[in-house]
Amino acid sequence: LRTGVVIFLLYFVVFLAVYPGFFVYDAQEEYLEVVTRSFTTHHPLFHVLMLGGIVQLVYKLTGSVNLGIAAYTLLQMAALSLIFRYFIWKLGEHGLRKRGQWILTLYLGICPPLVMFSLCSAKDGLFMGMLLIQVLLLLDLCEDVEAFWADRKKMLLFAVSAILMMLFRHNGCYAFL
C-alpha cells in the first residue's frame, strides 16, 4: 500500500499546481451530455455518466464545478495509484527486488505522460489502467492455467477489468479480443 500512497502523493504535488485537474477535450463534451441529458454514442456512456455524474453531484452539493472536477481527478489519481501499486507488487512476485520496486515507484510517480494521464479527465487513463491489469493477469494465466482458473479473485479481477476496459473506450472490445 505504501507504494500506492507514494505515487498518489507525487501526483498530488502536480495536482496542486494544475487544480482542479486537466478537464480537456472530450471531458467538456461528456459533462455537457450529462448536464443537458442529451446523450450520444460518440463517447462511451459509462465514462460519460461516471465523469458527469461525479462533477454534477459535487456541483449540486457545493455549487462549484471546479470542486466536482477536482473530486473526479482525485478519484482517478487514487485508482491509477492503486493499479500501479498492483503492477509493482506483481513484479515483486516475479523477482523485482525492493530497490527496483522503489525506483519503479518513483518513475511511475514522476514520469510526465503517466502523471498527465492520472490528472487528465479523459477516459484514456482509466482505460490504460484496466489494460495493464489485463496484461498482468494474462501473464499469470500463461504461467499456470490451472492455478489461474482455480483462483476466484483473479478470475473476478480479470472479468471486472475486462468489462471496464471495454466500457471506457469503444475500441476496448478490440483490445480485449
Model-derived features: positions:
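Extracytoplasmic catalytic/substrate-binding loops of multi-pass membrane glycan-assembly enzymes
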Residues: 18-30, 38-54, 63
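Short acidic/glycine- and proline-prone juxtamembrane loop motifs at membrane-interface regions
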Residues: 119-126
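Specific aromatic-rich, kink-prone transmembrane helix
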Residues: 86, 126-146, 162
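Short helix- or helix-capping micro-motifs
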Residues: 7, 101-112, 162, 166
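Transmembrane signal-anchor helices characteristic of membrane glycosylation enzymes that use polyprenol
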Residues: 2-23
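Transmembrane-helix signature of polytopic, membrane-embedded enzymes
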Residues: 2, 87-110, 128-129, 148-152
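Membrane-interface alpha helices of multi-pass inner-membrane proteins
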Residues: 154-169
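Transmembrane-helix motifs of polytopic, lipid-linked glycan transferases
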Residues: 71-95
